[in-house]
Structures are given as C-alpha cells and as structure tokens.
Amino acid sequence: MELHGEEQPPPPQEPWGRLLRLGAEEDEPQILLWKREWTIGRRRGCDLSFPSNKLVSGDHCKLTVDEISGEVTLEDTSTNGTVINKLQVVKKQTYPLQSGDIIYLVYRKNEPEHNVAYLYESLSGKQSLTQDSLEANKENMFHVTKDCSGPGQGDDPQVPLLSPMAQTCLEEPQPSTSTSDLLPTASTSSTEPELTSAGQKHSSSSGPGNTSISPKGRSSLVANGELSSLSPVFQDKEASFSLLESKDHEELEPAKKKMKGDGELDTNLQLLVSGQRGNAQTSSEDVKDASVKPDKMEETLTCIICQDLLHDCVSLQPCMHTFCAACYSGWMERSSLCPTCRCPVERICKNHILNNLVEAYLIQHPDKSRSEEDVRSMDARNKITQDMLQPKVRRSFSDEEGSSEDLLELSDVDSESSDISQPYIVCRQCPEYRRQAVQSLPCPVPESELGATLALGGEAPSTSASLPTAAPDYMCPLQGSHAICTCCFQPMPDRRAEREQDPRVAPQQCAVCLQPFCHLYWGCTRTGCFGCLAPFCELNLGDKCLDGVLNNNNYESDILKNYLATRGLTWKSVLTESLLALQRGVFMLSDYRITGNTVLCYCCGLRSFRELTYQYRQNIPASELPVTVTSRPDCYWGRNCRTQVKAHHAMKFNHICEQTRFKN
C-alpha cells in the first residue's frame, strides 16, 4: 500500500474524513482525507495505491466531498465493483457514504484473508476529534479485538460509555458496519452492550478467555465522526448479551439492531452458547437466531461476481463455471474469457439444475431472497439472448486427429423441429421418398442418375476414393427400420440383421465401435469424407494421419516422417508393412480381433494404425536414425510419459521405450 497523497504537504484546511484499515496493527497510521477527491486503486498515481495487489483495479474508486453540504460520495470505477458493508455492491455507480461505512475494495467471502477493507469516519462534525478520543477509538478498534486467551485476561472487559452526542447519532439508522474480519483468532466472541437514552450499559464477563467489543459496538463509537470519552466501568451483573462461538473458524454474522418506539436502541441478542438462550428481554420483533455453523449450501450457490445467491444462472463451456446471467452479461462485454479460470468461453448454457437448487434453497430460507428491485435490475442487465444459449453447434465426426475431422454445423433447434415435422424417417430407398423425388423432377432421368443426384442433396461431392456409383437395388418396407450414419447424419435402411444371413449385403457398421456408417452401403456424401467405413487395409486415413501419430509426441512423429520421406515411403507403406507383420504375429494390437480385412470406421482405424506405427518406429534400426536421435537417454516413464507432449522434454529424452520407473 502506498500513500501518494502524503508526498506533498497537505493544505492548511482540516481533513474531512479518515480511513482505518480493518485488521491493521495498533501502531499503523490512519489515512486522513483532506483533498476534495481521493482516488484509490492499483495505479501508482492514485492517492491510495495498491501496486502489488492484482485484485484491485487500476482505478478502483474515488471518494468525493461536497464542500458546501459536506456530503461524501463513493464513485466506483472498478471491474468487479466495490462492496459497502457486505450488503451493497456498487458497480459503475455512486454511493453516498456515511460515517461508519466499511468499504471493501476486495471482498472474498470464502477467502477472507484476501479482503482489503477500510472503515470510513467523517471528521466534519460539529466537534472535532481530540487526541484522547482518537487514541481511545484506536484502542477499541484494534486492541480489544485481539484474542485474550491467556489466563486471567479478559475477565472484566471494559465497556465504554457513550456521550449524549454520540447517542443522538446512533438514533438515526446507519448501514451495517460489521468488522468481523478484524477477528484474526480461531476462537473469538462478539459482544454488544445494550444502550439506553441515559447512557447506561451492561457489562459482561465471558470467563477467562475470549472477550471483545462487538463490531457494531465499535462502529457506533465512530458514527458521524464523534467519540465520547471512555471511562472503564466494572459491574458484577450477569451478561445480558450473547456470545457467538464458531467451531469452524468461520466468519460471524453481525446481529441486527432494532429501534424501539421511544428512540432507544434495542440490541437484545440471543445466547447461542451450549444451546442456551440468554435471559435478555426481547420485544415482539425478536432478532432471528444467528447461525453458529456456516451454511455450506449458501457458499456453493453464491455467485463469485456479486457475492450473492445465483439468480437465473448460466454455465460456461467447456469449464462449466457458473454465474448470474446479469453478472456475466457485464463481464462478457469486456472479455471473452471465464472470470474464474480465464478459459476461452465457447458456449453459454442455462444451468437448470442449479436454478432449481437455488429456488428450493430460497423456499427454506426466504430471508435470503433478493429484493424485488434487485431482481428487476438484474433482469434488465441480462444481455444473454436465446441465440447465445442455442448457437450453431459444431459437431465433429471423430475425436481423433485426421483429415476426416471436418466439422458439420447443425442446430439443436433445427433437429428438434425436424423430429416433430416428420412422423417417421424416410431415406432414399423408401417408396415415399422416390414418389416425392419423381414429382419434383422436370423430366425423367435414369434411376441410377436419380439416386446419385438425390444422394448429394445440394452438398459438394464426397472426396471418398471408392464412392459407389449407385445405391443397391432395394426398397424399404412401409415404415421400415432405419439407421443414421454417424458421419453424414443421413438415414439409410437398417439391414445389419439381414447381413448376418446374406454376406452380399454391404456392411453398415464398424466391427469395433458398432456405430452405423453408410459409405460401404451407398457412399457417404459428406464433404471431406475419405471413406468413413472400409476394410482396415483399404481405409483412407489421409495425409495428416502421421501428425502426432506417436502418442501425440510431435517430436518423435517428426523423426518418423523424416525417416519415411528420405526413403520415399508414405503412411500407406507403413500400414501395408505393419499389417503383414500383424499377420505374421510380429506386431500386436490391443484388440486381437482386428485384421487387415476387418471393417473399421475412420476413428477405430486411426487408433489401430497408431498402435502399429509405434511398433513400426520401435523396430527401425538405430543405425538408420540420426545420431541426435539415438544419443538421447530413455525417459523413465517411456511411452506412458505425460510430459512428452512438451517439445523441450521430447527433444531431451527418448520415449520410444517402455516404462522403467514406478511400474506396478
């Protein structure tokens, strides 16, 4: 933290306010506000600078005082907003500050150690602060909050009396000024004296251990910048206020104050120690029970941007982090990355499960619901449209690398509407399909050309090397069974059961994954398809099948490609030689059923080709490889190394070997 405003001597006018850092040491100096505008941020030119804290924006906020009325406002200029009293999130807006407000530049509910908070006090009251009252306030703010767990300490806490001026200030409603983050110890207690109009108080003795002035008690001492003289008073009376103990070392929630009809401040709290309630007198509007244990469900359902329960939440893909739709709408205008992990966002989707959980949670905890005004504001700030939630989805034919990975854009909405409009599937060999096609043709054409024309359906011709010229002479029965090609998503007659009886029927599925493909039946028409189904020995894997072919190790794969290029060999040569070695029993595949004649799809064929290529590279004599390749030591983890995808590690060690360390 740097104070650039103090580098120059301040003007002769009196300071109009000051900032006290929460959790500060006793001797840490206060920050006096004497300029009309006081800027706070990470930028070094700010009056209060945090150059090393990346959670603070460059220009986070600024405090401005009206010289005529004395009103102080906070204007937020940050990215994530400024939190006031843990209740009000100010984002790109101005907020009227009152004495006793706590300004959170960084507020992490689940990581309080990262919080950066300051207590604002006004010094523009009728009576200025004396040095004695200042020291007394610092004593209350910092000293008594420390853990007094030593024996004999804290038996008789000193509770200060308030002057009539300070009590008059307390009669006006003030924002919550909880400073529970000031309690650094694992076991603390929060106490609050009950004040009367005559300035009377009750003291408490919590035994030899934890004693501290309550957060609200401390904030009341600095309301409107006026402090009363402190006088220690000891009483033998039993405690009339409660202690809040937390075994989980979680943050304590401040108890709510209520005003009586005659102006007295009713701060009756309920005793929660050992399940007993205090004997304090309560009115008809009793304060609700404070939770002893933290609500894990609430923490799970909290948006990290607004630090409140999720509202109309959306999830980002692929990272699946969830935020309020309104909160993320403001974020996505500035960045296309996830606010949590900075992963590029590919898609936005509604998270119906979390929305239902939030709704069920609010039924059990209606007090934690957002206000109607807040809900209307969030709905108005929601810029996520239905088009963003249902974009064109890029569906890939395979998860493997290769030239057949050209993508096809399909819409979820289109597929749903087509299912509704068609009572059953009609393929090119259905009688209904042929009848419609003949009616749409201007002149008769041969049936073979008709089948080829309709097969294209307006798409570019298939790049398959073995595209059948005509569909088999077959007609589907009425409402017959159909299979959808995994490559082109077009229907075809499901004749797989018939093939078991008649081998002349063309194969329609992969022998390994059992997924249906139409290439061998009548030729796949998808653009870029090199033959999605074929016998292993005839499978067209494409020229890019050698990229990362050796366990995604690009360095080892480049060594193999250079070896083949110098000898005029291609991937087809590798496949042919490997299948011969497989037939002789020299090479092995993890799936023993696969031979050169096994009908495979592109994915399964590429996977088996990679297994054979590794064994092909393993059997290359060292004398035929460069010295820079053979001189590398073997990696301990061999072919199973997970770091071999990194270029530096792959160049340094040989990974065409078996694992020798930590092998079970």
UniProtKB/Swiss-Prot annotation:
Listed pathway(s): Protein modification; protein ubiquitination
Domain FHA: 38-89
Keyword field: ADP-ribosylation, Cell cycle, Cell division, Metal-binding, Mitosis, Nucleus, Phosphoprotein, Transferase, Ubl conjugation, Ubl conjugation pathway, Zinc, Zinc-finger
Organism domain of life: Eukaryota
Record-level Gene Ontology MF annotations: nucleotide binding; ubiquitin protein ligase activity; zinc ion binding
Gene3D superfamilies in alphabetical order: 2.60.200.20, 3.30.40.140, Zinc/RING finger domain, C3HC4 (zinc finger)
Polar residues bias: start-end ranges: 174-202
Acidic residues composition bias: residue spans: 399-413
Zinc finger (RING-type): 303-342
GO CC terms: nucleus; PML body
Record-listed Phosphothreonine modification sites: 385
Enzyme class: transferase
Ranges that cross the membrane: none
Keyword Zinc annotated: yes
GO biological process: cell division; meiotic spindle checkpoint signaling; mitotic cell cycle; mitotic G2/M transition checkpoint; positive regulation of proteasomal ubiquitin-dependent protein catabolic process; positive regulation of protein ubiquitination; protein destabilization; protein polyubiquitination
Record's function text: E3 ubiquitin-protein ligase that functions in the antephase checkpoint by actively delaying passage into mitosis in response to microtubule poisons. Acts in early prophase before chromosome condensation, when the centrosome move apart from each other along the periphery of the nucleus. Probably involved in signaling the presence of mitotic stress caused by microtubule poisons by mediating the 'Lys-48'-linked ubiquitination of target proteins, leading to their degradation by the proteasome. Promotes the ubiquitination and subsequent degradation of AURKA and PLK1.
PANTHER family referenced in this protein's UniProt entry, alphabetically: E3 UBIQUITIN-PROTEIN LIGASE CHFR, UBIQUITIN LIGASE PROTEIN CHFR
Family the entry assigns: Belongs to the CHFR family.
Protein name, UniProt field: E3 ubiquitin-protein ligase CHFR
Naturally occurring in which organism (per UniProt): Mus musculus
Taxonomic placement: Eukaryota, Metazoa, Chordata, Craniata, Vertebrata
